[in-house]
């Protein structure tokens, strides 16, 4: 589709003055080959693994939670109320607990009750930095998860921090290329991107923004209202896990699954972020090459790093400054030939 809005959208103010501008870092819980969503028996106990979603945790959350519920149903007679432990209080644990709690007695155990990886996520709905098997069955499962997740996010709306957005790109998106067309249709093809200085040809993908501070707070509040309050617990070994009194255990420990369940396929991928002050009127998303900009109600989130096998939640001020400069240059219409020399940039992945 060839399209052009004609209107010029406002560009961000990239002024970074503390304390309103904050540098952050998050570690994506990436898994080689595919995310893990399956049952692993341990004697009389069953662990349902739900981890390895990389940068797509919020995106896939409801779909994976729905899949977890279906796996639980295979373990118990129909209509039986079970005692279920959920490990992890990030988005995967919270959404799984939310769907399980109406029909089961759910307890959440986590080493972090807040301040999880999900809390520093950007929030665009797109399956980024996540793998799945190439088989037809695995592709179908992945696409079904995306369909369910998108539908459940969209149906919850603003009270869960969800709003429709157009994501503008210079080139076709690899992440959106994984999404079935009945979920996110083919992008609008634009003669010019709709910004004052960023006017190259591009595309517009109709997707969602899921704002983590609103979404996660709502999940936690709703669970607490139903009597499900996460408990602090540190698990160092599988024996610690299967020592729980619950016989069904949902493992949503993300990156921690690598050491806890001896999974060598789990790899940390650190991303640097700059949180600028919130700015009214920026009702769009942008992601291409070395930078992405996600305006939200709490911050304008600027990112673009991909540090493979780096597990460090301490922001790197130099890299954050680079990311901010690149985003500023993009929206000023400036090109930068030297960017490819930096291997940690998102554009190289």
Q: What label would you give each PLM region?
A:
Residues 56-63, 134-148, 202-218, 314-319:
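Short beta-strand to alpha-helix junction loop
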Residues 13, 25-44, 118-120, 148-226:
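Flavin (FAD/FMN) cofactor-binding and adjacent substrate-gating region
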Residues 128-134:
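A catalytic-pocket lid/entrance helix-loop region that shapes and gates access to the active site
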Residues 62-72, 197-236, 242-246, 252:
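Helical element adjacent to the flavin cofactor pocket in flavoenzyme catalytic cores
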Residues 71-79:
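Glycine-rich helix-loop-beta junction characteristic of Rossmann-like nucleotide cofactor-binding loops
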Residues 48, 84-86, 249:
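Short glycine-aspartate micro-motif
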Residues 1-43, 52, 57-60, 66, ...:
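Active-site substrate-recognition segment that forms the wall
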